[in-house]
Amino acid sequence: KYIHMKKLMYAVLSVILCLSAGTGYAQKKAFTIADLYKIHNVGTPLISPDGRHIAFTLTDYNLPKGKAMTDIYVMDTDGSNLKQVTKNGKGNENPLWTSDSKGLYYVSSVSETDQIYLYTFSDRQSHKITNFSMGVNDPVLSPDNKLIAFSTEVYPECGADSKCNAKTDSLATNGPVQAYLADHLLFRHWTEYAAGKCSHILIYNIKNHTYTDVTPGEFVSPTFMLGGGIGYNFSPDSKELCYVSNHEAHPEATTNSDLFIVPVTGGQAVDITKDNKAWDGSPVYSQDGKYIAYRKQLIPGYESDLFRIALYNRQTGESKIITNSFNNWIDDLKWDADSKSIYFTGEVLGQEPVFKIDIASQAITPVSGDKSIFGFDLDRKGNLYYTASSVEKPVALYCMKASDNTKVKQLTSFNRELEERVDIRPADTIWVAGADGVKVEVFIVKPHDFDPNKKYPLIMNVHGGPQSQWMNSFRGDWQVYPGAGYVLAFCNPHGSTGYGQEYTREISGDWGGKPFEDLMKVTDALASLSYVDSTRMGAMGWSYGGYMMNWFQAQTKRFKCLASMMGLYDLRSEWGGTEELWFPDFDLKGQPWNSDLYKKFSPSEYVRNFATPTLIITGQLDFRIPYTQGIQYFTTLQTLGIPSRLIIFKNDGHWPNVVKSMPLYYDAHLDWFHKYLGGAPAPYNVEKMVKNQAFTNK
């Protein structure tokens, strides 16, 4: 349901691995948790206005210290002259080229709060630009290079007054009374309480050093995005800003976010999509100024409705959808320089390639070929720069002609040493007849040192969302478990994206129906594979995947053990504890008192069937699926005498911290699966990891 983990690519390495079925793999070591944190993650490329350079971020990890270090790099568009711009590893993000290509604005956490800095290539120095007390997020530079729009949490009564915000925040944070006050819902979201603050968009005047709150009042702007990038952009003449906001009286119960236009000097905002009662967002102006392209849904309250591209004509005020022929989700949008076409990424069959649509004819053309792409940019010569990965290849930066996807050049090789030393496993694909005979795509990753004459334990991983898809991308899950001797399988059952919107829609109102049937038929197919030990099969899942683990507990005894992360256990109490009520209201067809689905599909209603040992992981700050869901489940299993273990991450929400918490997450899984399925032991002692003693001598 959170849109969002994506994109990928594969090339020479897969060929080498295929040619060396036995000895090639044996010469490399098995992939471990430690190897996962040696991966260098390359961020989305940004082409300089003169077309000569690429800026991007690079994130590295320190596993023993639980730290992530992100810095900004620049290189020529042919991949030469690589230079590291920032060298402090202090969360340097969001690089933005100046209009003359002689500098980079970026956000850094080097000071107490995130602020904007300007790096100038002439003196190779960074200069602090903003000093707003509440910090800075997601900056956007105006085309005339004079303004920077950014989002920040402010107290509405203070608006753009930095000192007022600082004083108010200090009293609220440090005063003797520590309480939350709410007179309406959505008083908390994701991992944070509103606490009197809300997100506003401010515009910083670079010359005058002034801040203007262009979204004053009690409304959240930009509203919570359903993917698709930042929720605001400048017009080409730098005179107005288009942004997304939800002005409904009950935003917790509706997806009706609209696009608003406001002068950069502030003033009355105009709602340009008020006629659509579903979600509108991701605005991007055409370079000729005639249109605003944006992503649009049509079904109110349905956050997983098809994302379409619509065009708003700035002269006539009319909007029209131009992607009616594309029946899969659309994510990132970028206008071509001539304003005659739009490039976009779309989720298709376990991939996320780039497509191009001609706005006049509405003809859609594949651009990148079958790749899973995380982010992309274009230059004026028709070159496409993008980051991608595949199951067997970590993320890297690539370039190709947008008109010819047969000639791809890899521009970065930060992970080459790891790829040469460690056995990073590829994935096979099979299709299995699921519910109603509909084919389900299944990815299978075989274990390190695979011998087709042996039998191996299997782990099935079920994705969350539920409206999302597993993709042919690089993930720690896909390598850590095969590295420990398991066959890993992951599939896209009914409800997944990428296989047509009807396939996605069929999970709504049927959480434990067709998706469960799909997964059971996939389990049958996997159990029949000659190299799978059908007596040693386990399953794991996160969010809706965690719910499915709990549903497995209630409906089947096919698995020797389960691992449920951030999973729903009791659907009725979950409704009262979550924050985005539009989701269960739509997917479960109402509220607990007027929909029988809360009982029909709640694992808690089938306790008499429980028998399978289960690992439960949750986050104390998870407001999407409150950690009490995991506690209720653990209490039930313990009372029944069913082997179970509970891990609560104290400082995490729905997504545990990637380097502070996820190592324990992986290790706890390996420990649990080793106990019940017989794969390799976990590399670290779980109890010592919880006590921060696992790396004391390293």
Per-segment meaning from a language model:
Residues 490-698:
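Active-site-proximal cap/loop segments of hydrolase catalytic domains
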Residues 49-50, 99-100, 143-144, 236-237, ...:
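Residue-level detector of Asp-centered blade-edge/turn motifs that repeat once per structural unit
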Residues 51-54, 101-105, 148, 241, ...:
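Hydrophobic beta-strand positions that form the internal "hydrophobic ladder"
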Residues 46, 149-151, 178-183, 187-215, ...:
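Non-catalytic accessory segments flanking enzyme active sites
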Residues 76-80, 120-124, 205-209, 263-267, ...:
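Short loop/turn segments that connect beta-strands within beta-propeller blades
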Residues 58-71, 86-92, 107-117, 131-137, ...:
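A flexible loop/linker signature enriched in serine peptidases of the S9 family
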Residues 406, 412-535, 542, 574-581:
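Cap/lid segment of the alpha/beta-hydrolase catalytic domain
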Residues 1-28:
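Bacterial Sec-dependent N-terminal signal peptides
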